[in-house]
C-alpha cells in the first residue's frame, strides 16, 4: 500500500501526509491504510478549493486560466494540511475577521462566499452513516459538512453541495480512479476491512514489491491549493523551483 500511495499521489501531498502522521506519532510503515486515507483526504480538500474564486462583484466563479487583470479573491481558505498550531492560528484569524463562531474541532476549509467552515469527509462506507458520525462529533450548525464516497455518492448539510456539478464530478472521478487502481492491485479489500488490512500488512512485511506502473491518467500536476501551502513546509530551493503562475498547471 505504501508504494502505491507514493506513486498514486502528488509528492507534496505525500509529504504533507507524512508530516501529519509524524505529528500524531503514527508510523506510516504500519498504518499504511491511514497513510492512504490521509493522502486521499488531503487531495480532495485541495481539489475542492482549486480554481474557485470570488470576483469584484462578490460572485463565486471558476477560473482555470491565468488572467493577470482579474481582481480575484480565493473563495476557500485551506486549513487542512497545516500543522495544528498554524491551523488554529488561521482559524482564529478568520473568526476575528469575519465574526464566525470558533469551531471546537479543526475544520478543513473556510468558505468566504457562504461565510462558513467546511468539514470534508471521504468514506469507504455508507455516506449517511459517516455523515451522522461527523455531525454527532462536531455538534455545530455553523460547520458545513460535505461527505464523498468512493462509489460516487455524496451527502451535505441541508443538501447544499457548495460546488458546481463539474467540480464535484471531478472529485468523484478521482475517488473512483483511486478505488479502481487499489482493486487492480488487490489493495481495496484491505483498505475497507480492518481484518483484511492485517492480512495485507503481514503480506507487505514479507514482500516489499514495488507497485506496478500506474495509469497515465493519474495527475502529477501541482494543485494551485498546494502552491498556497508551499511556503509553510517546503525549503526555499524547492519552493522557488515549483513557484509558477498560480493557475498554470503543467500538462503532460
Curated annotation (Swiss-Prot):
Keywords: Decay of host mRNAs by virus, Eukaryotic host gene expression shutoff by virus, Host cytoplasm, Host gene expression shutoff by virus, Host mRNA suppression by virus, Host nucleus, Host-virus interaction. The active site is at 80, 108. GO terms for biological process: viral RNA genome replication; viral translational frameshifting. It is found in: Host cytoplasm; Host nucleus. The record marks 28, 65, 202-203, 206 as: Important for efficient shutoff activity. InterPro entries: PA/PA-X, PA/PA-X_sf. The record marks 195, 198-199 as: Important for efficient shutoff activity and nuclear localization. One of its GO terms (molecular function) is RNA binding. The probable endonuclease active site in the N-terminus and the basic amino acid cluster in the C-terminus are important for the shutoff activity. The C-terminus acts as a nuclear localization signal. The C-terminus is recruited to host protein complexes involved in nuclear Pol II RNA processing. Plays a major role in the shutoff of the host protein expression by cleaving mRNAs probably via an endonuclease activity. This host shutoff allows the virus to escape from the host antiviral response. Hijacks host RNA splicing machinery to selectively target host RNAs containing introns for destruction. This may explain the preferential degradation of RNAs that have undergone co- or post-transcriptional processing. Belongs to the influenza viruses PA-X family. This is Protein PA-X.
Amino acid at each position: 500500500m505504501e508504494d502505491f500511495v507514493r506513486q498514486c499521489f502528488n509528492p507534496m501531498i505525500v509529504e504533507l501526509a507524512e508530516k501529519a502522521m509524524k505529528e500524531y506519532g503514527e508510523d506510516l510503515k504500519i498504518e499504511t491504510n491511514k497513510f492512504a486515507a490521509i493522502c486521499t483526504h488531503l487531495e480532495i480538500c485541495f481539489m475542492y478549493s482549486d480554481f474557485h474564486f470570488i470576483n469584484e462583484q462578490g460572485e463565486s466563479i471558476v477560473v482555470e486560466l491565468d488572467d493577470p487583470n482579474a481582481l480575484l479573491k480565493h473563495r476557500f481558505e485551506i486549513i487542512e494540511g497545516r500543522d495544528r498550531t498554524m491551523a488554529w492560528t488561521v482559524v482564529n484569524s478568520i473568526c476575528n475577521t469575519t465574526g464566525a463562531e470558533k469551531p471546537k474541532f479543526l475544520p478543513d476549509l473556510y468558505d468566504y462566499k457562504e461565510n462558513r467552515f467546511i468539514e470534508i469527509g471521504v468514506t469507504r462506507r455508507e455516506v449517511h452513516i459517516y455523515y451522522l458520525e461527523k455531525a454527532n462529533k462536531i455538534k455545530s450548525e455553523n460547520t458545513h459538512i460535505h461527505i464523498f464516497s468512493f462509489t460516487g455518492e455524496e451527502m451535505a448539510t441541508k443538501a447544499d453541495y457548495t460546488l458546481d456539478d463539474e467540480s464535484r464530478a471531478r472529485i468523484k472521478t478521482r475517488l473512483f480512479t483511486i478505488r479502481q487502481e487499489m482493486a487492480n492491485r488487490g489493495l481495496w479489500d484491505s483498505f475497507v476491512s480492518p481484518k483484511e488490512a492485517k492480512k495485507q500488512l503481514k503480506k507487505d512485511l514479507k514482500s516489499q514489491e514495488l507497485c506496478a506502473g500506474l495509469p497515465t491518467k493519474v495527475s502529477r500536476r501541482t494543485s494551485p491549493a498546494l502552491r498556497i501551502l508551499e511556503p509553510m513546509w517546503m525549503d526555499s530551493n524547492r519552493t522557488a523551483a515549483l513557484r509558477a503562475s498560480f493557475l498554470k498547471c503543467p500538462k503532460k
